[in-house]
Amino acid sequence: MALTADVKDEIARVSVVRAEDMNAEVAALLRYSGALHLVAGQIVVESEVDSSATARRLMEFVEQLYHHEAQLQIIGAGNLRKSARYIVKWIKGGTEIARRTGLIDRAGRPVQGLPRTIIGGPKSACVAAWRGAFLARGTLTEPGRSCALEVATPSNEAALALVGAGRRIGVTAKTRETRGVHRVVVKDAESISALLTLMGAQATRLVWEERRMRREVRATANRLANFDDANLRRSARAAVAAAARADRALEILGEDVPTHLAEAGQLRVKHRQASLEELGQLASPPMTKDAVAGRIRRLLSMADKRAEELDIPDTHAAVTEDLFQDVE
């Protein structure tokens, strides 16, 4: 989890000037790492995090915003804990903090998601909310077969709220439930890179991207080295040819191409040597290989008809021998 620790260390040092953004980060940190307790008729707010920098940042922000001091308890690493945990607790002022961060509504009832003022507020507040959520329960996996940035959430409502915040800043995220735990997952590499940059983890993003590219190069090299089987070579050539034709089809049709066909074509172009089954898994939502093949076939047919009408080169013209040099 070295990358996760690096991200948290980096974004815990990001400077926040606007009180609105500071409040959004605190609200998310408390929502995804916190709990409310009723003690002697008073609400006590508690947050448990895995980083001393995060704990200090949370305490400082709350004191700046609401002028309430916190108590800090450190639980050292032990047999069942690989690292120390930091428990930040507000006994005095807990009710005000819970209300102003949206943990409870005006009637004092617990709220499951994030305040509308954050989701519907400025984009900088949505970025701050993601930063707080990642500091609370985020992980970034090493680039591999399935790279991902994840945030564990206390409820489905909290997960959906984070997905909504991601949508506001151009990040594609999905909810997933595993063994009763709701998670928000970002799997697209471009979205992961964009989110890391937005949150303020540029240095870690560069390291992550370098590792990802290195692994992709190795994977491609290994894949080509194992292309001894003639059927695999033919499949690879067909995939490359289809990608070239799809690229030409999108060029011919321009904005007139139906969205679902355009998405299939773009997948084929972006992943030139992937199998139809792999393309189906990369689609959102996932599709069968037959569905992908059908959409690409309709895209090419539509483009070839348009090319004939316009008397211009069709999609077959894009397939030249130099395309296959990398798969020979």
Swiss-Prot record:
Pfam families: HTH_WhiA, LAGLIDADG_WhiA, WhiA_N. HAMAP family: HTH_type_WhiA. Keywords: Cell cycle, Cell division, DNA-binding. One of its GO terms (molecular function) is DNA binding. Belongs to the WhiA family. It comes from Corynebacterium urealyticum (strain ATCC 43042 / DSM 7109). Involved in cell division and chromosome segregation. GO terms for biological process: cell division; regulation of sporulation. This is Probable cell division protein WhiA. Coiled coil: none annotated. Residues 275-308 bind DNA.
